[in-house]
């Protein structure tokens, strides 16, 4: 019994020491605000004065890197992410992974474009995924415009349609992977920020006005909708059952990005506007059953063809982005020009 008591005492002593060391380690780590400030200092040493405080940040999602063409070629400054302190290198095909500073539209508004983003499924922490957003805040950005490629859950959506987001489901956050988890940094915002109006209404109104102007000048069958984005961790595309669940929960599109950035941007007081490009239609039908008589007699190739209908793939995502590039560029240019 004495030996057991001694062992228990040692265990509690070790647990207390481990907890104390963990707290001490956390206190020694530089805060996100400190790290973002160091990154901004590094960038401003290289930037001309008129680009040092961009008003708008634009995040280019999968297949949408062509948005960088909206930045005036004269005076443009750009760096690969790996050359910027604190920025992770993107490992996703279709994400160039670079920061681009310049001016845009006839108003010559200073902007910064993030061509590609870090994803949670790449193994990055939420802190790393959202670090670029915090850098934007320290730079002085007032408005963030985010784009992504997403799967369409709403049956009214077609591949190539654009969805202006008005709300989201943070599935990863609901199970503990939240970008604001941990000690709150008052330099950015309050401990419990409300998100009931995360997607700025006046910016969404501007988006619709801009879309109508674009359609008048460039007629197209492409439609713009307004809807709810479901954020999932990835990297697998959703199962049929998961798609039905998300649809029943009220989601119109589903993807693996954007929401952590939105949350951190709103926590920091920036206005946000976000668009999803529908790059595939999610499969909501149930998986064919093994005893389905209509499947009897089909060859292995015929069965594979039936099961592959509507299955998402990254190449499809990139191709849809290319096809929608002109409309997305025209929309973004009109919005930025009126900010």
Please provide the spans of the model-predicted regions:
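His/Asp/Glu-rich mid-to-C-terminal helical/loop segments that flank catalytic regions of hydrolases
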Residues: 282-339
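Structural motif
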Residues: 54-57, 109-113, 142-145, 161-163, ...
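Active-site rim beta-loop-alpha module in soluble metabolic enzymes
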Residues: 194-245
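A C-terminal functional module that forms or caps the active site or interfaces directly
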Residues: 236-297
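Glycine-rich beta-alpha junction loops
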Residues: 60-63, 151, 168-169, 226-234, ...
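Metabolite-binding pocket within alpha/beta catalytic cores that recognizes anionic/polar moieties
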Residues: 2-195
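Flexible, glycine/charged-enriched surface loops at secondary-structure junctions
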Residues: 52-54, 216-226, 317-321, 325, ...
């Amino acid at each position: 019994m004495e030996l057991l008591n001694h062992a228990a005492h040692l265990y509690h002593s070790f647990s207390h020491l481990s907890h104390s060391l963990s707290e001490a380690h956390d206190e020694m780590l530089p805060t996100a605000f400190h790290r973002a400030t160091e990154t901004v200092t590094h960038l401003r040493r290289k930037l001309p004065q008129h680009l040092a405080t961009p008003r708008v940040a634009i995040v280019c999602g999968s297949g949408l890197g062509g948005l960088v063409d909206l930045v005036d070629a004269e005076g443009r400054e750009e760096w690969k992410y790996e050359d910027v302190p604190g920025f992770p290198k993107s490992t996703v095909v279709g994400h160039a992974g670079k920061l681009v500073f310049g001016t845009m539209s006839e108003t010559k508004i200073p902007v910064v474009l993030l061509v590609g983003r870090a994803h949670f499924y790449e193994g990055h922490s939420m802190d790393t995924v959202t670090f670029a957003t915090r850098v934007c805040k320290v730079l002085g950005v007032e408005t963030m415009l985010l784009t992504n490629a997403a799967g369409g859950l709403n049956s009214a959506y077609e591949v190539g349609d654009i969805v202006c987001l008005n709300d989201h489901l943070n599935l990863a956050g609901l199970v503990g992977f939240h970008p604001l988890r941990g000690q709150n940094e008052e330099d950015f915002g309050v401990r419990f920020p409300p998100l009931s109006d995360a997607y700025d209404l006046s910016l969404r109104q501007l988006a619709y006005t801009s879309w109508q102007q674009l359609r008048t000048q460039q007629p197209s069958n492409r439609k713009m909708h307004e809807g709810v984005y479901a954020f999932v961790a990835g990297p697998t595309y959703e199962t049929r059952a998961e798609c039905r669940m998300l649809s029943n929960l009220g989601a119109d599109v589903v993807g693996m990005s954007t929401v952590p950035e939105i949350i951190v941007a709103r926590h920091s007081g920036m206005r946000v506007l976000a668009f999803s490009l529908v790059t595939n239609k999610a499969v909501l039908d149930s998986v064919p059953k093994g005893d389905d008589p209509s499947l009897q007699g089909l060859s292995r190739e015929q069965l594979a063809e039936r099961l592959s209908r509507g299955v998402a793939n990254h190449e499809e995502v990139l191709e849809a982005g290319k096809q929608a590039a002109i409309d997305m560029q025209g929309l973004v240019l009109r919005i930025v020009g009126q900010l």
